[in-house]
Structure formats: C-alpha cells, structure tokens
C-alpha cells in the first residue's frame, strides 16, 4: 500500500525570482552575491551595502537548510527596475495531533492550541487569515543583526514572517518562511508577503 502524494503549494510571484535547492550551499551563496550586485550595483563605494544585502540572503538560505526546507526562492526584482532582497523557503508538511477531521479550521485550532507547548516564537504576533482554501497563521519578528564592516559594526534589521498553512484534506500544516533585510519597513514588507500568500494555491499531485 502506497501513501498518496501530498498537494504542493504554488506561488504567483511578481517580477523575477530564482528557484534553488537550499541544500546546495555553494549555488545559493553565488546567487546571493549576484542578487546583491544587481540590487546595489558594482561600485566600489557600495561594497559595504552589498555585503549587508548578501548577508541577509545568505542567512535566509542557511536557515532554510537548517530547517530542511525543500525549496528556496530568491527575488531578483519585484518589477522591472525595482530590485528587492527577499527570500522564501517552503517546508515539508508536519502532522498535527490530536485533530478531529481534516477541515482547515479544525486542523488550525489543534495547531494553534499546541503552539504554547512548542519552541515556536513570537506567538504574540499571531495573525489569522485564509488563502488557497487553507487556514493560515502568520507569526513574525524583526531582529537586529550585527554586521562587521571595515573594522566597525553596523546594525541591520531583518524581518522574518512565518506562514503556517493547513494542508487540504490532511491533518497537516506546512510552513512557508519569508525573510528580508528590509526590516526597517516591516509594515510595507508584511503587506507584500501577505499579498504573496493571498495569491498562492495548492496543486494536486499528478497520479501515475
């Protein structure tokens, strides 16, 4: 007896993005460097700013690897001439127990009730929404990162938003993690992230 393949999330992303396997650290690092150059430019006097952007993308790819994400998406630009450093990682669904049935609200209630007993952070930021036929819970944080630049330390604020989707027809939730070094404008970036979630959909597996 074989287990039916799970549906997968699909995103309608604005602009130009690169899809990567987060397990390939060298390729992810090369794309981080390339995107930083495209966003900031190649000028020598912009080297410090390039390092900040690249550091944010490198951190996102490292976090995706550590969390065993199966897909990493890096934004090159959200519109022609509008480069934006954003990374999205998509993670394998996890089981939620105990859950009565597979209705999105039932699964989300069980998942939400379990959170205080887990290592999940930022529960005070919890925001509920619906998207793609799923119940979705958003948690977010803005953290200060210290970056060494030419003998001095610079602080950069990083925004991380974690979206937990219920998986259609299953007692599961799937994590989509969105991050950007543009943490100084969190409200604008959260609106952008929310719009990506609102436009997402589930793709049913193709039967063999």
Where are these regions (language model features)?
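Active-site-adjacent "gating/activation" loops or surface patches in catalytic cores
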Residues: 167-171
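Surface-exposed amphipathic alpha-helical segments
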Residues: 17, 175-208
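Short acidic, Gly/Pro-enriched loop/turn segments at secondary-structure junctions
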Residues: 22-35, 207-208
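Mixed-charge, low-complexity intrinsically disordered segments
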Residues: 30-60, 140-141, 154
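Signature of long, low-cysteine stretches enriched in small and polar/charged residues
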Residues: 62-163
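Soluble, non-membrane globular domain cores that form compact, hydrophobic packing
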Residues: 2-7, 205-207
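Proline-anchored loop/turn motifs at beta-strand termini and strand-loop-strand connectors
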Residues: 7-24
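Short, well-ordered beta-strand elements
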Residues: 87-91, 172-181
């Amino acid at each position: 007896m074989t287990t039916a393949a799970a549906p997968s999330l699909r995103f309608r992303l604005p602009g130009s993005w690169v899809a990567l396997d987060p397990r390939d650290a060298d390729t992810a690092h090369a794309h981080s460097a390339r995107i930083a150059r495209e966003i900031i430019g190649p000028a020598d006097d912009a080297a410090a700013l390039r390092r900040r952007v690249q550091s944010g993308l490198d951190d996102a790819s490292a976090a995706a690897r550590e969390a065993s994400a199966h897909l990493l998406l890096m934004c090159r630009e959200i519109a022609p001439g509008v480069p934006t450093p954003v990374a999205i990682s998509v993670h394998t669904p996890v089981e939620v127990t105990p859950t009565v049935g597979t209705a999105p609200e039932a699964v989300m209630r069980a998942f939400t009730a379990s959170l205080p007993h887990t290592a999940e952070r930022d529960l005070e930021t919890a925001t509920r929404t619906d998207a793609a036929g799923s119940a979705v819970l958003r948690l977010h944080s803005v953290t200060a990162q210290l970056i060494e630049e030419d003998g001095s330390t610079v602080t950069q604020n990083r925004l991380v938003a974690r979206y937990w989707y219920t998986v259609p027809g299953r007692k599961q939730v799937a994590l989509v993690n969105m991050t950007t070094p543009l943490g100084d404008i969190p409200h604008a970036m959260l609106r952008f992230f929310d719009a990506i979630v609102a436009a997402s959909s589930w793709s049913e597996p193709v039967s063999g």
